[in-house]
Amino acid sequence: MRDLKTYLSVAPVLSTLWFVALAGLLIEINRFFPDALTFPFF
């Protein structure tokens, strides 16, 4: 039971960190390539 409580307390933290990192990455991509619906450098 203690392992279940540890998992339930760790998963929201890890998912929050993942979404913050993903949002930061998308913000930085949009800062360097604004309004890039298509990426012409491919």
Curated annotation (Swiss-Prot):
Keyword annotations from UniProtKB, A to Z? Chloroplast, Membrane, Photosynthesis, Photosystem I, Plastid, Thylakoid, Transmembrane, Transmembrane helix
Record's bilayer topology term: Single-pass membrane protein
Q: What is its main location?
A: plastid
Query: Membrane-spanning regions, if any?
Result: 7-27
| InterPro entries in UniProt | PSI_PsaJ, PSI_PsaJ_sf
Q: Where in the cell is it found?
A: Plastid, Chloroplast thylakoid membrane
> Where is it found, in Gene Ontology cellular component terms?
chloroplast thylakoid membrane; photosystem I
Name one matching Pfam family: PSI_PsaJ
One GO term (biological process): photosynthesis
Q: What does this protein do?
A: May help in the organization of the PsaE and PsaF subunits.
Instruction: Describe the family membership recorded for this protein in Swiss-Prot or TrEMBL.
Output: Belongs to the PsaJ family.
Q: What is this protein called?
A: Photosystem I reaction center subunit IX
This protein's species is: Atropa belladonna
- Name the encoding gene, please: psaJ
